[in-house]
From Swiss-Prot:
<dbReference type="InterPro" id="IPR020578">
    <property type="entry name" value="Aminotrans_V_PyrdxlP_BS"/>
</dbReference>
<dbReference type="GO" id="GO:0051537">
    <property type="term" value="F:2 iron, 2 sulfur cluster binding"/>
</dbReference>
<keyword id="KW-0408">Iron</keyword>
<feature type="modified residue" description="N6-(pyridoxal phosphate)lysine">
    <location>
        <position position="206"/>
    </location>
</feature>
<keyword id="KW-0663">Pyridoxal phosphate</keyword>
<feature type="binding site">
    <location>
        <position position="243"/>
    </location>
    <ligand>
        <name>pyridoxal 5'-phosphate</name>
    </ligand>
</feature>
<dbReference type="InterPro" id="IPR015422">
    <property type="entry name" value="PyrdxlP-dep_Trfase_small"/>
</dbReference>
<feature type="binding site">
    <location>
        <begin position="203"/>
        <end position="205"/>
    </location>
    <ligand>
        <name>pyridoxal 5'-phosphate</name>
    </ligand>
</feature>
<dbReference type="GO" id="GO:0031071">
    <property type="term" value="F:cysteine desulfurase activity"/>
</dbReference>
<keyword id="KW-0411">Iron-sulfur</keyword>
<feature type="binding site">
    <location>
        <begin position="75"/>
        <end position="76"/>
    </location>
    <ligand>
        <name>pyridoxal 5'-phosphate</name>
    </ligand>
</feature>
<feature type="binding site">
    <location>
        <position position="183"/>
    </location>
    <ligand>
        <name>pyridoxal 5'-phosphate</name>
    </ligand>
</feature>
<keyword id="KW-0001">2Fe-2S</keyword>
<keyword id="KW-0479">Metal-binding</keyword>
<comment type="subunit">
    <text>Homodimer. Forms a heterotetramer with IscU, interacts with other sulfur acceptors.</text>
</comment>
<dbReference type="InterPro" id="IPR010240">
    <property type="entry name" value="Cys_deSase_IscS"/>
</dbReference>
<dbReference type="InterPro" id="IPR015424">
    <property type="entry name" value="PyrdxlP-dep_Trfase"/>
</dbReference>
């Protein structure tokens, strides 16, 4: 077993060796290096064929038509293109958008930008387990609502939203539904022939593909229109200009192909490992599970250890690559906005750790993690005056702390 142990698969994944090998064939003079938009020679035709194959592989995993797949630079761009693109195109119908407080920043900050441009956004607060109350969503829908954006799987706590029902609600009212599926693709079955989802964002690097490549699904029937955000040569049916990075697209295609083949057995294996991890630490005193094991994806376990500072715990666990919150916000010392939206107090939110498991996680690593966490929590609490007061029965919520 090699240290440190990587348990931050929700931040990014290593490229699968099979994917890397495939990508290498599309870089040098010996390989297929042409521009897929070059229509006048074989170098371009071969590159275009490789892109077509990858587009089919991506579409296959999610039950889409390959013509509904638009390649982008990643899920952040896909979220921007979907939300700004749809809002700009349909703004004559209305200027109201609904999303939730626990979305990824790529959705929240895009909505904030639209607010500056005159759109109105309703931010729904989830229930304490992270799931959106569909009655609240329904109550928020108005005649001028043009877009709902609610993610499939939350990147911090792993809870799964009921996107099928939300899709039905939106379709019945003629509202466009966008889903950020960054954390669910390759982990949960997605069938867009059945789901009434109009726009869906994906990435490559969360499922063992390369970074810097993603896709946006844009439904053809009924046809969804979006306004391009990147202008130029009119690539990707005019929705996203820019020379296609063939090696990255091929990598993403191969990653999606592998996911389709291995997803069912791999998720079963990871569910076992996640449960093993939780069973190994759940009897620690004052430990709280954030999210919902029943309605959660098997790759994420988010736990708060009361009376332990999250940052000091991460330092104590230096042999484990884990995070508190998401990578995108891990540079700030603010407690996780996702956990606070669940109604959690700052102290508990601050003491949270996200363990995310993946393809190369082993049972041995999980057992080592359990042992290390138990030891570290014990040691840090021994040093904590708050823990001592708690053990003596002091109600810490009643204490007036002096400001200095």
């Amino acid at each position: 077993m090699k240290l440190p142990i990587y348990l931050d698969y929700s931040a990014t994944t290593p490229v699968d060796p099979r994917v890397a090998e495939k990508m290498m064939q599309f870089l040098t003079m010996d390989g297929t290096f042409g521009n897929p938009a070059s229509r006048s020679h074989r170098f371009g035709w071969q590159a275009e064929e490789a892109v077509d194959i990858a587009r089919n592989q991506v579409a296959d995993l999610i039950g889409a038509d390959p013509r509904e797949i638009v390649f982008t630079s990643g899920a952040t761009e896909s979220d921007n293109l979907a939300i700004k693109g749809a809002a700009n195109f349909y703004q004559k119908k209305g200027k109201h958008i609904i999303t939730s407080k626990t979305e990824h920043k790529a959705v929240l900050d895009t909505c904030r930008q639209l607010e500056r441009e005159g759109f109105e956004v309703t931010y729904l607060a989830p229930q304490s387990n992270g799931i959106i109350d569909l009655k609240e969503l329904e109550a928020a829908m108005r005649d001028d609502t043009i877009l709902v954006s609610i993610m499939h799987v939350n990147n911090e706590i792993g809870v799964v939203q009921d996107i099928a029902t939300i899709g039905e609600m939106c379709r019945a009212r003629g509202i466009i539904y966008h889903v950020d599926a960054t954390q669910s693709v390759g982990k949960l079955p997605i069938d867009l022939t059945q789901l009434k989802v109009d726009l869906m964002s994906f990435t490559g690097h969360k499922i063992y593909g390369p970074k810097g490549i993603g896709a946006l699904y844009v439904r053809r029937k009924p046809r969804i229109r979006i306004e391009a955000q990147m202008h130029g040569g009119g690539h990707e049916r005019g929705m996203r200009s820019g020379t296609l990075p063939v090696h990255q697209i091929v990598g993403m295609g191969e990653a999606y192909r592998i996911a389709k083949e291995e997803m069912a057995s791999e998720m079963e294996r990871l569910r076992g490992l996640r449960n093993r991890l939780w069973n190994g630490i759940k009897d620690i005193e004052e430990v709280y599970l954030n999210g919902d094991l029943e309605q959660g994806v098997p790759t994420i376990l988010n736990v708060s250890f009361n009376y332990v500072e999250g940052e000091s715990l991460i330092m104590a666990l230096k042999d484990l690559a884990v995070s508190s919150g998401s990578a995108c916000t891990s540079a700030s010392l603010e407690p996780s906005y996702v956990l606070r939206a669940l109604g959690m107090n700052d102290e508990l939110a601050h003491s949270s750790i996200r363990f995310s498991l993946g393809r190369f996680t082993t049972e041995e690593e999980i057992d080592y993690t359990i042992e290390l966490v138990r030891k570290s929590i014990g040691r840090l609490r021994d040093l904590s005056p708050l823990w001592e007061m708690f053990k003596q029965g002091v109600d810490l919520t009643t204490i007036e702390w002096a400001h200095h």
